[in-house]
Curated annotation (Swiss-Prot):
Domain of life: Bacteria
Note on how the cofactor is bound: Binds 1 [4Fe-4S] cluster per subunit.
Active site: C229 (nucleophile)
Protein name: Adenosine 5'-phosphosulfate reductase
Annotated family: Belongs to the PAPS reductase family. CysH subfamily.
Function: Catalyzes the formation of sulfite from adenosine 5'-phosphosulfate (APS) using thioredoxin as an electron donor.
Binding positions ([4Fe-4S] cluster): C120, C121, C203, C206
GO molecular function: 4 iron, 4 sulfur cluster binding; adenylyl-sulfate reductase (thioredoxin) activity; metal ion binding; phosphoadenylyl-sulfate reductase (thioredoxin) activity
Pathway(s): Sulfur metabolism; hydrogen sulfide biosynthesis; sulfite from sulfate
Catalytic reactions of this protein: [thioredoxin]-disulfide + sulfite + AMP + 2 H(+) = adenosine 5'-phosphosulfate + [thioredoxin]-dithiol
Location in the cell: Cytoplasm
EC code(s) of this entry: 1.8.4.10
Amino acid sequence: MLTYETWEEDSMSFSERDETKGALAVLEWAYKQYNDEIVYACSFGVEGMVLLHLINEVNPFAQVVFLDTNVHFCETYALIERVRQRFPKLNIIEKQPGLTLEEQEDKYGKDLWEHNPNLCCKLRKILPLEELLANKNAWISGLRREQSETRKHTKFINQDHRFQSIKICPLIHWTWKEVWRYVYKHNLPYNPLHDVGYPSIGCEKCTLPVGKYGSSRDGRWAGSVKTECGLHDQ
């Protein structure tokens, strides 16, 4: 089994010539390699809908984790229930932070996401995933190279120094149009916020709609230099 400790650069290759641009082959390899020792960390954005559909084909009983910060859009929570109905065998869990919002406010002050968003992300997303991955050898992410400069060198299989794990990214070669084409083709549920200017959807407090010519990440932490929650930092 390939682990963080036994990592070998470029030890695997996958054909990218099928409809899924290699994604299905990567997932088949991942679940054969790791079985129950892998989890998909899903934000339930539109890329997530594609991955959930593909994962369901490979392993309908796969574990999926949603990092519930307790400040997501109500549309996101509603979508999770629709996904549960569409893929009833998937093991979808909602991972809670160590602190409630009230406990966080008592300890760090009101509206931490405004005056220290990095700490807020650490408490409500990074530490919960870190706790979960302590018992796993690998995790799956919906990163695409097209999304941003910080993601353009992502590979199918990555040594993840942040979580000392293996990070699997099946959709690296997909474009925004290809993602939506797949969603429409398979009649997949998706967050209605995508239809009103939200290409990337995170916590309600830190996500804004973007203009017609904005990039897919422009609405996240708008007005600050922050571009990532920290899950994908190396």
